[in-house]
């Protein structure tokens, strides 16, 4: 039912993954109102839905402690400006999507001014910096959770929450059509194909591209006609990737696409960095190797704070190691190539067993996330 009330909603996202979540939520909310306006910070997807963005996510997207320190004065100024503008608009509700170090502090201040705040995507308090849960309790009226293992943490701390599943699980089919996707990307049905995703941030691309592509070279030397596909959506990242690989004699195709999961579903295996890409790969039912490397000094400083055995979402969701992970020194071309060679030569029984694991995990988070989030937001602005 469409409501005639005029509603003003503030949203802030800090990364591409938040832009994806944000645009789905905006589309769902638009169905409920005759007049609804969105203001804040978003990416091109959210702008395409007529959200008024005062800053672009590129101005927030940073990586590492040094990046935060260098950008701190600008970030603080942005936060002050956002608070001033949101108060002037008299928001009905504010939704901070992920990006916790910025959004939680913003939510805390808005809440003190009487604005209802929702935090969408739990910080990885189950992995490290668990004290952030207390900041969330002070800053927000409710937390929207994407994964089932998060709910018990919030229940123990007495923080209002709702497990809504993940929008990507609603978007990606339970049984991706590999044949059709191979036709879409012009991949012969009998061609062995590897998807490589070296990251979504410039720093990740800088660190991981050479390692990943030297791995690809080792595999192409071993597997005749192995096709390497690189799905990237950002022109700057594509240019950076091509520059970094210019001296490595490996054949590959860069696919300028917003739906990397389709490329992974078409591939026989994938090599990717940790993060949302591991979830997409699982939902695409594609065998994967997960790798990550960061500044060794930073890693030494934070290693004792990390509380989980695994970094990839498939392993965290399964509660056991169903995909291989290679971190820091173990993230080298030889180890990655050896593991991928094994995956690329999976027999049908091995492939089916892994895909069934992925299928059951997919079902566990396929819960109509945008609809659930919308209903909760309507309750908080007294429309349900």
UniProtKB/Swiss-Prot annotation:
Gene Ontology MF terms: lipid-A-disaccharide synthase activity; phospholipid binding
Known catalytic reactions: 2-N,3-O-bis[(3R)-3-hydroxytetradecanoyl]-alpha-D-glucosaminyl 1-phosphate + UDP-2-N,3-O-bis[(3R)-3-hydroxytetradecanoyl]-alpha-D-glucosamine = lipid A disaccharide (E. coli) + UDP + H(+); a lipid X + a UDP-2-N,3-O-bis[(3R)-3-hydroxyacyl]-alpha-D-glucosamine = a lipid A disaccharide + UDP + H(+)
Entries under CDD domains matching the protein: Glycosyltransferase_GTB-type
Swiss-Prot/TrEMBL keywords: Glycosyltransferase, Lipid A biosynthesis, Lipid biosynthesis, Lipid metabolism, Transferase
Pfam family, one: LpxB
GO cellular component, one term: membrane
Known pathway: Glycolipid biosynthesis; lipid IV(A) biosynthesis; lipid IV(A) from (3R)-3-hydroxytetradecanoyl-[acyl-carrier-protein] and UDP-N-acetyl-alpha-D-glucosamine: step 5/6
An example Gene Ontology biological process: lipid A biosynthetic process
Family matches, as InterPro entries: Glyco_trans_19
EC number: 2.4.1.182
PANTHER family in alphabetical order: LIPID-A-DISACCHARIDE SYNTHASE (PTHR30372), LIPID-A-DISACCHARIDE SYNTHASE, MITOCHONDRIAL-RELATED (PTHR30372:SF4)
Function: Condensation of UDP-2,3-diacylglucosamine and 2,3-diacylglucosamine-1-phosphate to form lipid A disaccharide, a precursor of lipid A, a phosphorylated glycolipid that anchors the lipopolysaccharide to the outer membrane of the cell.
Family: Belongs to the LpxB family.
Entry protein name: Lipid-A-disaccharide synthase
Record organism: Blochmanniella floridana
Organismal lineage: Bacteria, Pseudomonadati, Pseudomonadota, Gammaproteobacteria, Enterobacterales
